[in-house]
Amino acid sequence: DASGATLAKRQQVVNHLLEHIYDHTHFTDLKNIAGTFSPEAATSIYTDDMEELRDGRLLEQHHWFSLFNTRQRMLFEVLIHCKSWECFLDNAAYFRERMNEGEFVYAIYVAVIHSGIGHGIVIPPIYEVTPHIFTNSEVINKAYSAKMTQTPGRFNMDFTGTKKNKEQRVAYFGEDIGMNIHHVTWHMDFPFWWKDSYGYHLDRKGELFFWVHHQLTARFDSERISNWIDVVDEIHWSCIEGFAPHTSYKYGGEFPARPDNVHFEDVDGVARVRDSRIRDALAHGYLLDNSGNKSSVYSPNVQYYGAIHNTAHIMIGRQGDHKFDMPPGVMEHFETATRDPSFFRLHKYMDNIFKEHKDSLPPYTKNDIAVPGVVIDSVAQLKTFFDTFEVNLGNAKVADVAISADVHRINHEEFSYNIDISNTDKIFICPVKDDNGIMDKFYKSIDPGTNHIVRKSVDSSVTVPDRQYALDLHMFERSCGIPNRDMIIIESRPDGMDFALFVTVDDPEEIGATHSQHGIKKYPDKKPMGYPVDRSIPDNRVFLESPNIKRTYVKVFHDEHGGEQH
């Protein structure tokens, strides 16, 4: 219930709560609430009866935070159970001054996303709330120097590593701030720890997990091909590639680096056991519950099957010797995980498990794919380049000095699909010999006869535009997706790279509207994620001879000097 507070007021309060999060608030209204509010006056909303607060066991401020620790997600439990805006505001203001900053930011973001109280509120881009996580240590040090001398500055930020490391050729992909935001926002929309008791069921969360991360690995493989690198192999519990993030926690030191060829003691054996249990379930077609009986997908025996994905993130993030008391690595934070090459190795491993299930399903027949009466007549026929993106570093320091960083990123010229047909369209692109990724999905009603459709790249439903600066936040719809300006097509090469472009048309009565992979409402597409290319295609004729599917070839060029596009 947000009664008594306008959307503009709630938006302003959330902005103020997240401003200079590592310092005490300077807003009088929040100060007054934090000094006078008593959580003990509303004990019914605290699931643990405030034991952590009473015993002085709140995670301390100026310390690193990990969402994989159940105790460090407890503030969300408080905020999600607030029944009124006043209750939400009182608790947020109170705990902002007393609780760990990382835990507070995470709780605010996820609560605003999932609570009715947060409806309509646009959360500031998290890279401006905690900029040190998204920029390298050199830039942050320059920002502090500028702050100390009260000298405005705009600093250039390079990708990590050197040319001696072949993974550096594709660092622009995993280290892209838009990619980092996409990944962390998706995990906020679909938390792995979500319970239906919070208010609703997250529809098709597991399948969405597969599809979203499959898209990331498919795009990453395509980027590697365009840079003359082999596609990524699945992880085998020796991390072949090392990684040095060159990034610091606000408090707690540098993110730890990992050398090449790190072997995990005992992990390989445990992983093989858990892996074999999951693959055995795939072969039998069912899971087991805690009593050893057949289970629904919502109540498997977690102790038996394990949590491979989450455990792997923790293991890779904490690979150092515990006697050195190092903070978690980048893999333990969804904001930074995609920077580490092992992230894509892990998700290729996860993807292969899902593919094993998909390959066990019967292939689609021509009757499954075809839409009677619909024919795609033609698809008319891209140069990529690097540009810079300005990141505001205002929350990285204390004094009000204009400080920002320029980050290099891949970009492309705006383009359009010209299609003669009808109905719900899906558009896929892949290198001629490897991997596919969805570029767009949209709904279009058609009239009898020929329909000419022009679809602009900026309208793609699987991408989002750049986020607004926190200072410019007024009315901007929150959403998550891969960055429109750089990730919808592949970097390619200066001499060009051939891609196959597929357009498919589906029956809207069977599909539904287009929301793509994000949102907290019921997923509107009833077909499997990635349909019709999600299963094996033993006979290409079934696929290519369907009148509602059209394949064409495009050539993508990369302009090393930037600017012009083909």
UniProtKB/Swiss-Prot annotation:
Hemocyanins are copper-containing oxygen carriers occurring freely dissolved in the hemolymph of many mollusks and arthropods. GO terms for cellular component: extracellular region. This is Hemocyanin B chain. Hemolymph. GO terms for molecular function: metal ion binding; oxidoreductase activity; oxygen carrier activity. The keyword Transport applies. Cu cation A binds at H183, H187, H213. It is found in: Secreted, Extracellular space. Its main location: secreted. Keywords: Copper, Disulfide bond, Metal-binding, Oxygen transport, Secreted, Transport. It comes from Astacus leptodactylus (Turkish narrow-clawed crayfish).
